[in-house]
């Protein structure tokens, strides 16, 4: 009987969505400059980079359009040093390489 209880507990532990090994900490902050990309980050030329390199630099896009090979990111554009105006960065790919950056 005790073996069945131990086996049952082990099965519940193994098949539950909880994990002891994975311990992620998510930090939420109200600082917009840290939450969004800043336009200063785009002074570098990203043309010719692969999708994997762009994901390594910017992280996963908020939306990726697989039919048109476009990644979309939200960026922060400061206006006269006061506040943050949200803009959308569109990164276009041709043959898995960056062909164009568009900020709207």
Swiss-Prot record:
Looking up Pfam families in the UniProt record yields:
BamE
| Localisation per UniProt entry | Cell outer membrane
Which chain regions cross the lipid bilayer?
none
Q: What is its main location?
A: membrane
What's a GO cellular component annotated to this UniProt protein?
A: cell outer membrane
What the protein does comes down to: Part of the outer membrane protein assembly complex, which is involved in assembly and insertion of beta-barrel proteins into the outer membrane.
Family listed? Belongs to the BamE family.
Q: Would you tell me the protein name for this molecule?
A: Outer membrane protein assembly factor BamE
Q: What organism is listed for this UniProt entry? A: Buchnera aphidicola subsp. Schizaphis graminum (strain Sg)
Quick one: which gene encodes this? bamE
